[in-house]
Design a protein with these regions (language model features):
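Disordered inhibitory propeptide/activation segment of secreted metzincin zinc metalloprotease zymogens
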Residues: 19-57, 64-66, 133-141, 234-238
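Charged/polar, solvent-exposed surface patches and flexible loops
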Residues: 30, 34, 76, 80-83, ...
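Metalloprotease/metallohydrolase-associated module, dominated by Zn2+-dependent proteases
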Residues: 42, 120-161, 177-238
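Metzincin-family zinc-dependent endopeptidase catalytic domain
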Residues: 64, 70-167, 172-183
């Protein structure tokens, strides 16, 4: 893990000369804050850590050409996310009970309408952020724990964009909900369209899913804890 973080710190410095004025640990804590607590639509910070504590049992909402094509992509994305969260992901059949995660595809023109059919409350899929989205996620929380999620993606997107979109939304539905172009290189930076996790993304996932980062942890406490975890892994922060 220590060698892994050394690579991350080198990547941060290469990404932005401004990082020279800020220790690597401080910069990663800032990235953690942007992605975990930022809220691009509400304009205010989310108050607590949200994360999964139970295995994820996912299914595809319907059987169509997009699912046939992109099932291996989703499986690969989940395998990558599992490495850095210690979550388990199991696909179940479309008629099997017990799912807590649903993935659906529809043409962009009908994506919002389709999303409403999968939402716990159709009215929650409303507003400009959905009307202009090429993919989006919905998540449901109990006591800081994520207990259900939906990911919707436009089936007529260009291939590379859809691969990126799936990875970003799947990761965001795990408790890292915000996009922020200050985080680079990262899947959470919409200007880059990465199709695999960057080193920075892997650290952010590890921080959220460190056992000490409990669901419902208030933001201020979580930032202190993230700083302490990074200090253990990179003493001195430089």
């Amino acid at each position: 893990m220590r060698a892994f973080l050394c690579l991350v710190f080198a990547a941060i410095l290469a990404a932005s000369p401004a990082a020279a004025q800020q220790t690597e640990n401080e910069r990663l804590v800032a990235y953690f804050d942007y992605v975990v607590f930022g809220n691009e639509f509400a304009g205010r910070a989310l108050p607590t850590v949200r994360k999964w504590t139970e295995p994820i049992r996912y299914k595809f909402a319907s059987n169509n050409a997009a699912i046939t094509k992109y099932r291996p992509v989703v499986q690969a994305h989940f395998a990558s996310l599992a490495q850095f969260t210690n979550l388990s992901f199991q696909e179940i059949g479309p008629r099997d009970p017990g799912e807590n995660f649903i993935i659906g595809f529809a043409p962009l023109a009908g994506l919002v309408a389709y999303g409403r059919t999968l939402a716990a409350n159709p009215a929650e899929v409303a507003g400009r952020q959905f009307e202009t989205a090429s993919c989006f996620f919905l998540s449901y929380i109990q006591d800081g724990r994520l207990v259900a999620a939906r990911v919707l993606a436009g089936s007529d997107l260009p291939d590379q964009e859809l691969v990126h979109c799936l990875l970003e939304e799947l990761a965001q539905s795990l408790g890292l909900p915000n996009d922020d172009d200050r985080v680079a290189p990262s899947i959470f930076n919409d200007s880059l369209h990465l199709t695999s996790l960057s080193l920075i993304d892997k650290v952010l996932l590890r921080l959220v899913y460190d056992p000490r980062m409990r669901p419902g942890t208030p933001r201020a406490q979580a930032l202190q804890l993230a700083r302490a975890i990074l200090a253990e892994l990179n003493p001195g922060g430089g």
